[in-house]
Amino acid sequence: MISHIAQDITQCPHTKNPVFWNSNGIYSELTSEILKGIVDIVKIDFKYGNDKCAMRISKAPPNYVSIIRRNLKRAKSYSEVLIRVLVLPGHLDCCLRNILEYIRRDLGEYVRVNVMFQYRPEYKVMESEFTELKRRLSKGDVERVYKIVRESGLKNVIF
């Protein structure tokens, strides 16, 4: 499917509009190669800072973190990158802190990061075993997020 999309995009060389790729970050190396030279901006959602949380909550692949990191590094080599991080209650240290430390260390302090507080416990999560996710972020959580972001050293973070 990605090859068909890429073909359609390349057949419109007259457009001056940037091509924006919005993804959960779980895609193949082949997809990344196809996107190279076509996409101007890549936005990847980086939700979990470790594989254990990713698999437990979202049934993500067991190598979730390495896939996201691989695709972020590749995307940064051929496009602008925006990383979106949804803050989950109970996952500030195990996920948020790990994600921000990785970004600073491996992608640089000026990579665009959007830290989002919009998490709402809805739908099936209220019936799930994920007790930490059955609440919104508290005021204390939000204050800790700001502290974690400051400590990360990232310089291009929006909320």
Protein language model features and the residues they cover:
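Conserved AdoMet/S-adenosylmethionine-binding subsite of the radical SAM
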Residues: 1-127
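A general structural signal for short secondary-structure boundary/capping elements
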Residues: 69, 130-131, 158-159
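Domain-scale selection of a single, long terminal region
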Residues: 123, 134-135, 154
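A structural motif corresponding to the C-terminal lobe/cap of the Radical SAM core domain
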Residues: 131-147
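A cross-taxonomic marker for long C-terminal extensions/tails that follow the last structured domain
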Residues: 143-159
